[in-house]
Amino acid sequence: MKIPVLPAVVLLSLLVLHSAQGATLGGPEEESTIENYASRPEAFNTPFLNIDKLRSAFKADEFLNWHALFESIKRKLPFLNWDAFPKLKGLRSATPDAQ
């Protein structure tokens, strides 16, 4: 599937321009007070960071195991034609890396 670059750039530029204009057309500025902020910062909000998903992505047996990492990416992106990437296929060894 080929995506024409110029129309995509024009559409993205229009979207950015539209959002920038919408931001400038907003109402009057609010005062910044402590009541405007949440009681806890987002840095400590575990659903916001999704730490459990990050931990599951870096299991001890698959971390820096390039074969397992490549297979994981292939499972996450099944819609790509992986035979079109012979260089990546050639870089993989026949056996998984010894950790």
From Swiss-Prot:
Cellular localisation: Secreted
Induction and repression of expression: Up-regulated in situ in psoriatic skin (at protein level).
GO cellular component, one term: extracellular space
Keyword check for Secreted: yes
Annotated GO biological process: cell differentiation; epidermis development
Pfam family, one: KRTDAP
Signal peptide: 1-22
Source domain of life: Eukaryota
Disulphides: none
UniProt keyword annotations, A-Z: Differentiation, Secreted, Signal
Keyword Secreted set for record: yes
Function: May act as a soluble regulator of keratinocyte differentiation. May play an important role in embryonic skin morphogenesis.
PANTHER family: KERATINOCYTE DIFFERENTIATION-ASSOCIATED PROTEIN
Protein name, entry field: Keratinocyte differentiation-associated protein
